Swiss-Prot record:
This is Sulfur carrier protein FdhD. Keywords: Cytoplasm, Molybdenum cofactor biosynthesis. Belongs to the FdhD family. The gene is fdhD. GO terms for cellular component: cytosol. Induction: Repressed by aerobiosis. The lineage of its organism: Bacteria, Pseudomonadati, Pseudomonadota, Gammaproteobacteria, Enterobacterales.
Length: 277
């Protein structure tokens, strides 16, 4: 690889996800000021030279995003199915170029779809309505969680949103231990992308999906439930509400879904047997 190209790639992967722009405040429309705004760029996931999906995302931690997306969409079963990965600039955004095993690439080609996604959209561009809600193996019941430990985690979720603290424009997804401690998290302008980044990182580091839960700062859509279940997550906590389809998918795949998570409050939609209070 040429030095100039390598330097360009390093610059791309070291982006902070924040850009300063000129803007005006309501109380002073005569004088512009600089403020931080979250970056949102098109990110294409390219498998073995073929573009599979374009998502709008924050330009950070894209390797984790690509790995998490590949796992949560059933493209791969393990990080070992990916032989290599590079993040490179393209004409209008970024590409994550992924080298899949031959077996996985053949499977991908059989069900290939092209998405032109809105921000973190998990449905845009599916070829048929039947493609929505892929079958998920029912989850086992291997753990419990004390809801009294949730409040402390909620207080620290913002720690994983440095861009969000500057801009007010990102979602977070974090892993919560049974003690309530958050031991890793990611943020993104797209809630699904933030979750994929978390799933990708934990898989890359070989962490177990047992003994813990996912906590997200957003609502719980069916895609969030499905992605979590595809990776073996048994419990999903969301700060906002759940949709009807999210509840249906969670019920079907044995995932414990909890919404409206605030200090002293939580609404359990499915499988409360994993929870105590």
């Amino acid at each position: 690889m040429k030095k100039t190209q390598r330097k360009e790639i390093e610059n791309v992967t070291n982006i902070t996800g924040v850009r300063q722009i000129e803007l005006w405040r309501r109380d002073d429309l005569q004088h512009p000021r600089l403020d931080e705004v979250a970056e949102e760029v098109p990110v294409a996931l390219v498998y073995n030279g073929i573009s599979h999906v374009v998502m709008m995302a924050s330009p950070k931690d894209l390797e984790y995003f690509a790995l998490g997306f590949s796992l949560s969409e059933g493209i791969i079963e393990s990080p070992r199915d990916i032989f290599g990965m590079d993040v490179v600039p393209s004409c209008n955004g970024l590409e994550v170029q992924i080298e899949l095993s031959s077996r996985r690439f053949m499977g991908l080609k059989e069900r290939r779809r092209a998405l032109a996604g809105r921000t973190g959209c998990g449905v845009c561009g599916v070829e048929q309505l039947n493609d929505i809600g892929k079958p998920v193996q029912p989850l086992p019941f291997t753990q419990t969680f004390d809801l009294n430990k949730l409040d402390d985690a909620l207080r620290h979720l913002n720690d994983f949103q440095p861009v969000g603290q500057l801009t007010g424009c990102t979602h977070a997804a974090a892993w919560m231990l049974p003690s309530g401690e958050l031991v890793g998290g990611h943020e993104d302008v797209g809630r699904h992308v933030a979750l994929d980044k978390l799933l990708g990182r934990r898989s890359q580091e070989g962490e177990s999906w047992q003994q813990g839960a996912v906590l997200v700062s957003s609502r719980a859509s069916y895609e969030m439930v499905q992605k979590s279940a595809m990776c073996g997550v048994e419990i999903l906590f969301a700060v906002s509400a759940a949709t009807t389809l999210a509840v249906e998918v969670a019920e079907r795949c044995n995932l414990t879904l909890v919404g409206f998570c605030k200090p002293g409050r939580a609404t359990v939609y499915t499988h409360p047997q994993r929870l105590s209070n």
